[in-house]
Amino acid sequence: MIMEFEFSKMLEEVLTWIVAHLDGPLWDATIIILLGTGLFFTITTGFVQFRLFPASLREMWFGRSVEGSSLTPFQAFTTGLASRVGVGNIGGVATAIALGGEGAVFWMWVTAFIGMSSAFAESTLAQLFKIQDKDGSFRGGPAYYIVQGLKSRCMAVAFALALIFTFGFAFNSVQANSIVEATSNAWNWKGEYVGISLVIFTALIIFGGVKRIAIISSNLVPMMALFYLIMAVIILGMHIDMIPSVIHRIVQSAFSFDAAAGGMFGALVSKAMMMGIKRGLFSNEAGMGSAPNSAAAAHVKHPVSQGLVQMLGVFVDTMIVCTCTAVIILLSNNYGSETLKSISLTQNALQYHIGEFGAHFLAFILLLFAYSSIIGNYAYAESNIRFIKNKPWLVLLFRLMVLFFVYFGAVRSGNVVWNFADTVMAVMAIINLIAILMLSPIVWKLMKDYQRQLKEGKTPEFKIDEYPELRKKIFDSRIWK
């Protein structure tokens, strides 16, 4: 038997203490800022998630090829989707329902709908403020638009560190933990062996470079999503007459009050709302500041183009994939069991609908989902490591720490890694949401430029020389010549 590292046990105790003291106050602030920012951009952009939804489909589909070494819009979309479409759609939804009840699904919908406008804003800004490397590829994200747009290196570094801890360490621990739970339930695989295997296969990928990561994600994500959705549609079709009652239960339960624990607002909001918002943010990442890192890597003619593409990713993640998972769970007779939470709840629901095959099928699909999420998470975090200090030794150290946290998640308690993820993602989201609020005038300016060109019958193309006030802020304005 492979022994667990003593350090991982000590780390679990430290993380438990940190979460106990910080999670409540952090989520008080996060709920207010997350929903407030989403509503602000929804209103000030004239409900961009409705008006420009058809344009987002065009931008994604017709951006499948580009010359040079930068990512295509489609690859940037699927890299973002690799992180969005994963454990959050399967284990996250199940956890939300287990802890927050049926109504948590409604609040996941609300978070996604409002968050689509925040996702649009953050990814548009990431495109504008991106920089170009020597090999011709692009990189960027919140740290880049904070330091250029707000001229705050300290705030940018704080965000970069928060993202590194969230995606490089915490979220990858969650992904590994979920793989272990799924494979243990289906095939009785031991966590230690699964953890070591994940470390090996992750190492093979993360030393291959971001371009390679994008290619793998581009190939895997559509296939994974398609398989999972086909299975979901088959199950929903088998119970089509029961779906209206399930939707009614979701909406009705959303407004029943059962106070959530922790923080000032823990006594003012329901468990359904708290868990729906937490798991909704974990799943779709709208406004968190993660997707802009892949959005910045895309080669597009106008910043708004990639903002629309990433907005579409939020819709696909929550309104389609998460909803399918939720309905599958709520249609099963085993919903509400005290012993079934997270991945095991979803596996049990599938087993109820389609037999033993369901548990095995989900374990295989989740293995692919979670592994691709680890790849996408790493890509986000590496970009921010290079922002802080682009030194080979630091990148190497970071990669080794990523591998450690993958193993840590595989062998430690699910409650510990999920709570750790909740806490650090709240810090990351707060910093990013404040930044995009402060940069909102730039978002409006770019959107007006895009819409003006559409009305003139042109393919929108951003010319930085027409906006000298923006050219002065951007480090690499040659990109938009």
UniProtKB/Swiss-Prot annotation:
The chain crosses the membrane at residues 30-50, 96-116, 154-174, 196-216, 220-240, 250-270, 311-331, 354-374, 391-411, 424-444. Keywords: Cell inner membrane, Cell membrane, Membrane, Symport, Transmembrane, Transmembrane helix, Transport. It is found in: Cell inner membrane. This is Uncharacterized transporter HI_0183. It comes from the Bacteria. It is a multi-pass membrane protein. GO terms for cellular component: plasma membrane. Belongs to the alanine or glycine:cation symporter (AGCS) (TC 2.A.25) family. The keyword Repeat does not apply. The keyword Transmembrane applies. One of its GO terms (molecular function) is amino acid:sodium symporter activity. Pfam families: Na_Ala_symp. It comes from Haemophilus influenzae (strain ATCC 51907 / DSM 11121 / KW20 / Rd). Signal peptide: none annotated.
